[in-house]
């Protein structure tokens, strides 16, 4: 399983995950990335989302219709910047991931997890076994 010490984070990774920051839309690694695989917490390595739930939302950040495991996600009320939103954090590392909104695809439950690329790492399907995520291969064989 991939893990990263907080001292190894880049400036933007630290700002996003530890200071509740947001990276620029359309200028991040995964906003337009649709390869088959999983997205894990940048710090803990815990699986959070899969490419099966990723969709193109035109918002400029990676968007997912649901989390891989709801127990790995914490949702908190966020009243920053004069808005009322739902913040999404990783349960294991308590890292800020992004926000969840109710404007996702209706056929997939209506949620849009809007996630900062700087908070996640993509693991290609072909590397799941090698990197310790082999138990998730069956998720793609449904």
Curated annotation (Swiss-Prot):
The UniProt entry, under Pfam families, shows: SelR
Please list the residues that make up the active site: 114 (nucleophile)
Q: Which GO terms describe its cellular component?
A: cytoplasm
What's the EC number here?
1.8.4.12
List UniProt keywords, sorted A-Z. Oxidoreductase
Keyword Oxidoreductase included in the entry's annotation: yes
InterPro entries, alphabetized: Met_Sox_Rdtase_MsrB, Met_Sox_Rdtase_MsrB_dom, Mss4-like_sf
Enzymatic reactions:
L-methionyl-[protein] + [thioredoxin]-disulfide + H2O = L-methionyl-(R)-S-oxide-[protein] + [thioredoxin]-dithiol
Q: Name one GO biological process term.
A: protein repair
Which Gene3D superfamilies does the UniProt record give?
Answer: Peptide methionine sulfoxide reductase
Q: Which residues form the MsrB domain?
A: 2-125
Signal peptide bounds: none
Single Gene Ontology MF annotation: peptide-methionine (R)-S-oxide reductase activity
Superkingdom in the source lineage: Bacteria
NCBIfam families of this UniProt entry?
peptide-methionine (R)-S-oxide reductase MsrB
Task: Name the protein family.
Answer: Belongs to the MsrB Met sulfoxide reductase family.
Further information:
Stereospecific for the R isomer of MetO.
Protein name (Swiss-Prot/TrEMBL): Peptide methionine sulfoxide reductase MsrB
Name the gene that codes for it: msrB
């Amino acid at each position: 399983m991939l893990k990263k010490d907080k001292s190894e984070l880049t400036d933007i990774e630290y700002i996003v995950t530890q200071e509740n920051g947001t990276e620029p839309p359309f200028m991040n690694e995964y906003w337009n990335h649709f390869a088959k695989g999983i997205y894990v917490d940048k710090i803990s390595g815990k699986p959070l989302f899969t490419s099966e739930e990723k969709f193109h939302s035109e918002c400029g950040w990676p968007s997912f219709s649901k989390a891989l495991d709801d127990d790995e996600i914490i949702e908190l009320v966020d009243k920053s910047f004069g808005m009322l939103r739902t913040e999404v954090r990783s349960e294991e590392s308590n890292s800020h991931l992004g926000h969840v909104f109710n404007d996702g695809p209706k056929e997939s439950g209506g949620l849009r997890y809007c996630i900062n690329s700087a908070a996640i790492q993509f693991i290609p399907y072909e590397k799941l076994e090698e990197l310790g995520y082999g138990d998730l291969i069956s998720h793609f064989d449904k």
